[in-house]
């Protein structure tokens, strides 16, 4: 288990932070909460004192009319207070979900806008998951920190009033109640500490359980689950995480159960002692029957307020820790510029030279000194078509993500037209790049909207979108569809949606990259899901599709590299060989060896098919 880190922010700091946000986002909630304190205090004291008045009136032989006036007057006052309380409570409740929604919206927007590398860091993801789990529930700190603090203020007022009343009659009863509350508070502290110490473990188990649940319900995996009989494995994995979750829950609840049992025993002892003291005083004539009821009620309310205060302070401390999660996630540093930076080159000035200077990169989760890329030096000339090849895990995709501004170098720098890309506004820098990555992610838009990367039809240049679809090889498919480019994507979201094949999805991604008309076009295995005919068509059109751009091209099929100006062969995170196809073949090195293996494999396959025919 990881060594627990000390919280970055103190409880007081987090409380002040939460109150400032509450005032900024829901000022009316606080203003309408102010009448609550005098109303609750008066209602409690009146509820204690009114029975004494009635009992004393009866024992003193007052008339029924006098008693009736007392009862009616009391309930009229109570009714008026409850009307005011109900009105202010309803006004407060309007903001019940507003504040946590503000926290969650800000959290989500930060998730969208933070450096991409931050979303790929397990430690940062844990911070986000913890903060999001609190902001997304009405029982978290985001929704209840102010409410808990307000409850403490109300309970302190009640406690002070009851303590003053009890002290006048018998200080020993007050001491008994305080001792009982202190013992209960210690139990509560121990249980809260246990919950805090196991919060990360709980979050990790719930994350794993949630992943398995999401995986099993994802339509994309349904075929694999059925064909490969994965149901049993998924069921076993879910049960394993469920069992671990239940174990943690049982351990926590066992402690709370012990606290509740202790609370009942303490309540019994406290009530017994109070009854003995007050009964003795009643028989000695020191108090009246009305005083007896009044004092017993005061003891009960004092114990309740002390219990609430102790519980609320522990809860407030826990909420403070949770608020710290939120603040710590927002404190994660951004290395790239967001919303500021040097002006980016205009499209008219593109393409431009791109240079990697002694670039090394290590993933945040990597152990020790394990680098994905080591001391990479390369210069991509303006308008050059560059192939990046190598075995799986060599570092090809990592290099491309660095170029795209998704990752930043651990060492060295990347320069566009002589300017370090970290000096640009990264969001503007992204506008210079079109990319087709290995991962295909479709979102529920129309085909036209998806290609134009917008959900507003008026922003779509339909002629341009159709041209890009045709260039990508989807023209005939679009013409076959009843709604053409207005067909919705992703079945399961809309009833009239369509599903595309793997190859068609890859063509759609290519069409989107072409529509953007950026100065840098990154193609990461753009033919992986295409059939041989479609793949060959793409090769033939490659120069036309990337005309006027700088285009890094990643491929496992080395035959495709003939269309590129230069080839970089990467091995173990380093550039092992560099040159044109003919130059690398003449070197008879690693590239030539791999090319020979692939050529022999494809040649043997062709011969086998011809023999079978």
Where do the language-model regions lie?
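ABC-fold ATPase nucleotide-binding domain signature/coupling loops
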Residues: 128, 370-371, 409, 415, ...
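Cytosolic ends of transmembrane helices, especially the final helix of ABC transmembrane type-1 domains
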Residues: 230, 273-274, 295-332
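C-terminal portion of ABC ATPase nucleotide-binding domains
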Residues: 484, 540, 548, 556-557, ...
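Helix-to-loop junction immediately C-terminal to a conserved catalytic motif
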Residues: 404
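Extended non-transmembrane interhelical loops and adjacent amphipathic helices
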Residues: 1-16, 97-143, 205-251, 319-333, ...
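Transmembrane helix-loop-helix hairpins at lipid-water interfaces of multipass membrane proteins
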Residues: 30-84, 162-195, 273-276, 280, ...
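Membrane-integrated ABC transporters
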Residues: 1-43, 64, 88, 92, ...
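ABC ATPase nucleotide-binding domain helical subdomain, centered on the C-loop/LSGGQ "ABC signature"
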Residues: 415, 430, 448-495, 539-540, ...
């Amino acid at each position: 288990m990881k060594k627990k880190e000390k919280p970055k922010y103190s409880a007081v700091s987090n409380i002040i932070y939460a109150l400032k946000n509450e005032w900024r986002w829901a000022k009316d909630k606080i203003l309408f909460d102010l009448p609550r304190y005098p109303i609750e205090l008066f209602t409690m004291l009146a509820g204690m004192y009114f029975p004494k008045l009635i009992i004393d009136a009866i024992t003193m032989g007052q008339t029924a009319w006098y008693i009736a006036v007392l009862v009616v007057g009391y309930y009229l006052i109570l009714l008026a207070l409850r009307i005011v309380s109900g009105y202010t409570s309803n006004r407060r409740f309007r903001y019940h979900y507003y504040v946590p929604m503000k926290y969650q919206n800000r959290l989500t927007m930060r998730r969208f806008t933070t450096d991409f590398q931050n979303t790929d860091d397990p430690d940062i993801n844990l911070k986000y998951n913890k903060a999001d789990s609190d902001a997304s529930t009405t029982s978290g700190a985001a929704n209840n920190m102010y409410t808990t603090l307000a409850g403490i203020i109300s309970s302190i007022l009640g406690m002070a009033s009851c303590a003053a009343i009890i002290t006048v009659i018998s200080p020993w009863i007050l001491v008994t109640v305080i001792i009982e509350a202190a013992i209960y508070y210690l139990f509560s502290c121990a249980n809260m500490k246990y919950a805090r110490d196991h919060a990360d473990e709980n979050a990790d188990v719930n994350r794993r359980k949630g992943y398995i649940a999401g995986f099993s319900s994802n339509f994309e995996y349904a075929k694999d689950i059925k064909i490969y009989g994965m149901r049993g494995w998924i069921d076993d994995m879910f049960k394993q995480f469920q069992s671990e979750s239940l174990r943690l829950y049982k351990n926590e609840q066992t402690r709370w159960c012990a606290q509740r049992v202790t609370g009942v025993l303490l309540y019994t002892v406290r009530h017994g002692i109070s009854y003995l003291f007050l009964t003795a005083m009643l028989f000695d004539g020191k108090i009246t029957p009305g005083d007896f009821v009044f004092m017993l009620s005061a003891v009960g309310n004092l114990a309740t307020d002390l219990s609430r205060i102790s519980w609320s302070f522990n809860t407030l401390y826990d909420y403070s820790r949770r608020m710290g999660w939120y603040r710590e996630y927002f404190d994660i540093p951004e290395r790239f510029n967001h919303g500021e930076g040097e002006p980016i080159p205009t499209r008219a000035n593109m393409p431009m030279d791109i240079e990697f200077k002694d670039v090394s990169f290590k993933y945040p989760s990597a152990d020790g000194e394990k680098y994905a890329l080591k001391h990479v030096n390369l210069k991509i000339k303006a308008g050059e078509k560059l192939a990046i090849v190598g075995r799986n895990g060599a570092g090809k995709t990592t290099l491309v993500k660095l170029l795209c501004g998704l990752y930043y170098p651990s060492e060295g720098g990347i320069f566009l037209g002589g300017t370090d890309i970290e000096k640009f506004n990264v969001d503007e820098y992204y506008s210079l790049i079109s990319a087709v990555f290995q991962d295909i992610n479709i979102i529920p838009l129309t085909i036209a909207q998806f290609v134009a990367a917008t959900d507003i039809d008026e922003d779509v240049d339909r002629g341009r979108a159709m041209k890009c679809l045709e260039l990508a090889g989807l023209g005939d498919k679009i013409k076959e569809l009843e709604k053409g480019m207005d067909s919705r994507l992703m079945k399961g979201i809309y009833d009239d949606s369509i599903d595309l094949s793997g190859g068609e999805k890859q063509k759609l991604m290519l069409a989107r990259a072409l529509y953007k008309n950026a100065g840098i076009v990154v193609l990461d295995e753009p033919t992986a899901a295409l059939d041989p005919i479609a793949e060959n068509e793409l090769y033939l059109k490659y120069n036309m599709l990337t005309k006027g751009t700088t285009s890094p091209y990643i491929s496992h099929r080395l035959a495709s590299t003939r269309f590129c100006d230069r080839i970089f062969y990467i091995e173990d995170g380093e550039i092992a060989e560099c040159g044109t196809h003919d130059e690398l073949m003449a070197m008879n090195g690693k590239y030539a060896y791999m090319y020979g293996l692939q050529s022999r494999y494809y040649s043997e396959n062709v011969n086998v098919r011809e023999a079978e025919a």
